[in-house]
A protein has these predicted regions:
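Secretory targeting and sorting signals
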Residues: 1-24
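Primary mode marks residue(s) on the alpha4-beta5-alpha5 output face of response regulator receiver
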Residues: 25-53, 57-186, 193-291
């Protein structure tokens, strides 16, 4: 079922931060990435098996395919700013009336959600977030859809203006205002077991923090990575059928392989996340680094 989101004015073109609630924002940094390519490949779940996955839309590393390794990724270029981020990011391809819809851009936020100091992701770390086989709404703490950052016009005795409005969260692709962007958000776990770069199910080596603390089995706090894919509303609003390559609209998920220039990532984590406060939310008007 499509969900209609109403706004009194046009939406901002910029990608909105992950949904905000009351409270002060802490520090974070981000990569802004352009769409790179599509392929029925998944180097985490189906390595060395080209064409055997459902279709994915890749951003970041320009070379990501079924055979990708840390070494191959580090030799390739990136669609991200900063250029030091040569990591691989991907999510299922969105289809409107059977036609693939490429994201216009993606934002990858790196936040601190724990009270403990944050360590950089180890080189080559692999993660999966969200459920590709979901048949009902997933927790919005992990994945959700919205219409990005909206502006509402107001008028008063001293003139008018506009204020940002936090968008409504939906479990399915929403119908957005014409200039808005439908956005898929996926939040990755932020606690690591400190030993493995991957695990048999690509999840067991990672965990989500609870109340700002990492569980005993995953004691190492790492950046809380939030991936946001933005799609043009005009490409999906008139469609009769909308789905993801992994199945229905509930199947939002994403994958990540850390291939950052490691010294650059370490500098950002230490200089930004570990010098700031815990940031459970983001300022919805801020779409750039906030350190």
């Amino acid at each position: 079922m499509r969900v209609t989101i109403l706004a009194a004015a046009a939406a901002l073109a910029a990608i909105a931060a992950p949904a905000a609630t009351a409270g002060a924002s802490g520090s974070y940094f981000l990569s802004i990435c352009q769409f790179s390519h599509r392929a029925a490949d998944d180097p985490i779940v189906l390595p060395r098996s080209p064409g055997f996955s459902h279709d994915h839309s890749f951003v970041g590393n320009l070379s990501t395919n079924a055979f990708s390794t840390l070494g191959s990724l580090r030799k390739a270029g990136t669609s991200c700013t900063p250029q030091a981020d040569t990591s691989a990011y991907w999510a299922p391809t969105l289809y409107a009336d059977g036609r693939p819809v490429a994201p216009v851009k993606a934002a990858i936020y790196y936040r601190r959600l724990t009270t403990a100091p944050v360590r950089p992701f180890p080189a080559g770390l692999r993660m999966v977030a969200g459920n590709a086989h979901a048949y009902k709404p997933q927790s919005p703490a992990i994945t959700y859809w919205d219409c990005g950052l909206l502006k509402t016009t107001f008028y008063g005795p001293n003139g008018g203006g506009s204020i940002p409005v936090t968008p409504a969260v939906s479990s399915t692709v929403p119908v957005c205002p014409p200039k808005a962007e439908g956005q898929l958000h996926v939040n990755f776990p932020d606690c690591w077991d400190g030993r493995r770069l991957d695990s048999f199910d690509h999840r067991s080596h990672m965990a989500y923090a609870r109340d700002g603390r990492c569980p005993a089995g995953h004691p190492v706090a790492v950046p809380a990575l939030s991936l946001v894919y933005a799609y043009p509303a005009r490409a999906v609003d008139a469609a009769r059928t909308i789905g993801l390559s992994s199945g229905g609209q509930y199947t939002g998920h994403a994958d990540f392989i850390n291939a950052w220039n490691q010294p650059a990532l370490t500098k950002l984590v230490r200089g930004c996340l570990d010098n700031g406060s815990v940031s459970p939310t983001l300022d919805p008007t801020q779409t750039y680094n906030h350190c």
